[in-house]
Each structure stands twice: as C-alpha cells, then as structure tokens.
Amino acid sequence: MTLDPNIPASPLDKKWTTYKNNAKLVSPANKRKFELIIVGSGLAGASAAATLAEQGYKVKCFCYQDSPRRAHSIAAQGGINAAKNYQNDGDSVYRLFYDTIKGGDFRSREANVHRLAQVSVNIIDQKFAQGVPFAREYGGLLDNRSFGGAQVSRTFYARGQTGQQLLLGAYAGLSHQIALGSVKMFPRTEMLDLVLVDGHAKGIIVRDLNTGEITSHAADAVLLCTGGYGNVFYLSTNARGCNVTATFRAHKRGALFANPCFTQIHPTCIPVSGDYQSKLTLMSESLRTDGRIWVPKRKEDCGKEPSSIPEADRDYFLERKYPSYGNLAPRDISSRSAKEACDEGRGVGPGGLGVYLDFADAIKRLGQKTIEERYGNLFEMYQNITGENAYERPMRIYPAVHYTMGGLWVDYNLMSNIPGLHVLGEANFSDHGANRLGASALMQGLADGYFVIPYTLGNYLTTQFGKKVDANHPAFEQALKETTAHVQRLIDIKGTRPVDSFHRELGLIMWDYCGMARSAEGLTEAIEKIQKLRKEFWSDLKLIGGADGINMDLERAGRVADFLEFGELMCLDALTRDESCGGHFRTEHQTPDGEALRNDEQYSFVSAWKYEGEGNTSTLIKEPLVYEQVKPSTRSYK
C-alpha cells in the first residue's frame, strides 16, 4: 500500500489558499441531502458539528458523556496558541509553523502544520465573537503569555480555565443547532464499531450506556473526534473515561494507525500519592511562565524544608541546561530533565519523585495579587489536593502522561485511508510530530472543526451522490451481530479478577517500558507481558451485572480490552522506530549530554500500521516526510 497525503502542489504558504480555491463544493440544496455522523463532542467534535450543521448538513453527534459539556477538552487549563503578534514581539505565521515543526522534532507533516499556523489567527476572532472571556491587559486589549518551546508570547488564555471557556463557546453553537433540529445529539452513547460498505465508511454501531441497547446508524460520512489514548497508561491527566475504543475499532476495520508510540509526558503534574489513585492532576504549563523549577544540589538536602535551602544550594536545572528557554523548554525535554534529577536521588517529596515549582521570585517581583489574578484557581486546586499553600511553599510536581501525538492516519483532507472516514483533533496524528508544544491542542481541535473540515469534506461528498445506504444494509446487520457477540463474550468470562486490576497492571507495564525511557530489551519484554496479560484477561475477567441497563464495569471492560491490544501496538511501534525523537526516547540513541538522537536518514517517515487480524503482527506502511521549507536540524533549546 502506498500512502498519498494529497498535498497541493503549490508553494508552502500558498497550499491552503490553492486548495480552497480548487476544492469541490456541495450546493446548499444538496447539503440537505447528506447525513453526517460525528463521534465526540469536545472542541473538535462540537465545532465541526455546529459548523457543518450551519452549512446545511444533517448531523448526528454522539458522546459517551452525559452532556457534550463534559468532554475532556473542558480540562485544558493554560491557553491556546495563535499567531496574532499582539505583543509585537516578532511572532508570525511562519514562526508558529517553525516552532511547531521544531517542537515535534521534525516528525510532522509540513503542509498540515503550516495550515494549522495559518488558520490559528481565525480561531481567536471566532471565540471572541462567541463571548469567550479571554484575559485582558490593563488597557483592555487581549493578553498573551508564554508557553514552552517558544520565545514569543502567543498564548491566549482565560485564567486557568481556557479549555472550559472554549468548550462552552463551542457548546453554545452546538446547542443552537440542536435547537434548530440540524443536529441530533446522542449523549451517553458509545461507538463500538465502524461499518464499511464497499470499502467506504457508512455508519457506526453504538451502545446506549443507559439502556444497554446496541443499535446502528448510517450516514454519508463519519467524523471521529474522540481524543487521545493516554489512559492506556492507567494513570494520566486524562479523564477516567478517555479511551482508544472508537479509533482502535476503526483501525481494526482497516484504518491505519500512525505513530502510536508518540506520547507526551507533561512535566508539571501533581505527583502520585498512593496506589489508590485512578488518575493524576495536571498543573498548567502556564505556571512555568512565572514559576522556577529546581531541586537541591545535594541529596542530603532533599528532606529539608525548601525555604531552609539557600539559593547557592539549589539547582535550577532547566535554566542551567537550556538558558535560551529556561523553564519554558519543551515538555519532552523538561520531563526527561526532571526524571534525570530524581533518578540521581535529588527528587523531593514521598519516594523522591518530585521537583519544586517555586513562585517566590515572581511574588517578590510582581506581588501576590498579580499571581492570584493569573493562576488563582490553579493554586486553589493544588491546595485542595495537597493541603499545601503554594504562595508560601513551592509546589511539588512530577511528569505524567498527558497527550498523544499519534492517532489515525489522515491525508491533507483529514480523511483516513478509509474513504469517508475523517479524523479530527487529537484523534489524528498529523500536526504535532513526536512532541506537541503547549497550548497547541486546543488550537488544532478548533482549527480542524471550524476552519479545515468545512472546506475539505466536500471533496469526498461530491463523489457520493446516489450512493446512500441505510442501516438495513447487510453490512450493518453483520456489524451489529459481531458487536453484540463481543459484548456478550466479555460478560460470559465469569473469572475472578476485576477489570481495574488488569488496567492498572497494563498501565504499569506501559509506564515502565514505554514511558519516558525506552529500550529494545524493555519493549520486547513489555510485548511479552502484555500478550500474557491479555490472555489472562480473556480467561479470568470478572464482571458484575449484564448487558442491559447501566453497567460501568462492562463499559470499562470493553475499553480495557482495546487497550490490551493497542498497548502492544504502541510497544511494537516504539521498538521498530530505532531512534530517539521528541517524546520517543530510546536509551540506546542519545547524545553525550543525554539529548534525543534522531536518525533522519532511516526514520524520517510516518509509521502507519495496518491491522492484520487477531494474533497476527501488524504491518508497517511508511509515509516519507518531505520538507520543502525547513531543513531538519539538531533540535536545540540551549
């Protein structure tokens, strides 16, 4: 199989304009004839559903939450990037494009990233028009702050609740279309399979999480906006319900999964406090704008009160190692540096798994009131969880799984290799390479939903006149039968181990062998352990209740079953990519000073994996990465 990214043959800065000028259009009268299914109601899903419905399409939107407002986009804290250059500090579309390419360690598709930078400027205007209360300077102008991997201030924010405010704006547009009857919303409904007819995506199989009823829905195109798969690690900053099921079930129907091993470990999270935990809490990257990260220089000082350790005995390791960026070095680099300090025995807090994030200098320079205005809700959240006052004592933080750069493979149209299956936001792979810069996830989700898919979808739909199918087609009946059997198979195991015990064990395997540091030996061992654990899962799973009605045990079991297959694919991808790049750090490939050592000669490609059936090894298909505008170079933030 040869992958065609369908990139326009124009100069980089003209590609998107050229594409839009030549894109095929669906007339208003014909838009009413097309039905679309959108799975997911976060920023990508809600913005796509509202925009496409406004254009005249009939839209069905599905989410497993009880309301679209509870999509995980609501948890994003720090901000959203846009190349507005309001600070007059040298920012531009090109600089945002280059920072994103460089931040991803030259493992993302150039054309998609440039388009993202171009449309970023429209997002802020759209959200401002929806009433999103972005922070403002004293004079009333929109404010910006700095995020990792950038030397300009381009991040717009709404205190520490940016994701919440952006999602409420998108939800307002979605609600308007629901009220008009243009969007039919299906909350508490989980996608369990993708239905193909003649090789095209024509619908989905879903389970009503309240009644347990399994039904089928047909459409002319399917859009997956289902987020990332960080919960394969069990402990992550993701909401408990976040999962890989929708994208992985599409993968098992033939959609290629790209770069699954590219996962992001966020440097500023509240450390694990005990085995009882089921998730971790993010402390926004925006805190690194004013906070300074340090550990004691001497191991014997780690148990002391931080205020008693003199300045001369503190190691501000990011400022020392990366003077040009300091505490705003990219996430992958910052996380590895924190781990390195803790591995040396200089970590603080229980188990030595923590570093300090200190605001004493910022409070002295700006005053506590200013810090409260910028980060007050984050400081309150930290105190509620830890019982410590971060105005008086440094926060303790440690890296944790946060975001996934991998996802289903898509071309320039955001369409997967399955015709009619489009993938938006974190669910696709296209924009962030091997490491995402802070404040760029919200940017991608809204860019895809508001400003990309409304232009690209017509290129597919114009080929589908007269090809409508309904849910009575034999393909739907077969998929419905298979899904029902899969659910019943889980219930019929009747073993002794609860589902969470399998998930926790899988997460530990993934963290130990496919986390911040990876090796060929460790990944090989991880694959063997996952295969053994999966076999035990299918023979010893204990579920409470049946298939009818609300059964959260059954919901989790289906998701963990997918994680147990997907985790092996992640490890296989990490094993096959015999280099270090971004968040993928192979210990065999590092520079003398411990930085990631890329191998552009052999690995400058997208790893797209094809499912080959249960028990068979997936097939690797490569999409070469072609750089017209930038020349891949050694990534340096020093």
PLM segments and residue spans:
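Extreme N-terminal leader/targeting segments of oxidoreductases
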Residues: M1-L36, E54, T634-R635
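Core beta-strand elements of the Rossmann-like FAD/NAD(P) dinucleotide-binding domain
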Residues: R32-F34, G212-A221, N417
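N-terminal Rossmann-like FAD-binding beta1-loop-alpha1 element of flavoenzymes
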Residues: L36-C61
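Glycine-rich FAD pyrophosphate-binding loop
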Residues: E54-A76
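Conserved redox-cofactor binding core of oxidoreductases
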Residues: I123-E213, C225, C269-L280, R288
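Glycine-rich loop(s) and the adjacent beta-strand/alpha-helix scaffold that form part
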Residues: A221-L280, N435-Y455
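An anion/pyrophosphate-binding glycine-rich loop and adjacent beta-alpha core
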Residues: R249, L256-N384, Y455-N459
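Long, amphipathic alpha-helical stalk/connector segments used for oligomerization, subunit docking
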Residues: N459-I550
